[in-house]
């Protein structure tokens, strides 16, 4: 599926994971598990997590650790495929 189609489908998806003060290490396995069950997963980066960097930086780091692809970041939320 093209990136544009994935972004369109992501619009209606709710965030199912939240990254807070525990950092991204605490959600890597859960993101991987959810991606096994669904095509798209949205992750919201709470203020406590964003102290470690920008949303784009955190999203990229999480994608590398979970072997996922960042479809898009918007505000404090990232969508993975």
Predicted regions and their residues:
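Positively charged, polar, low-complexity stretches
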Residues: 1-81
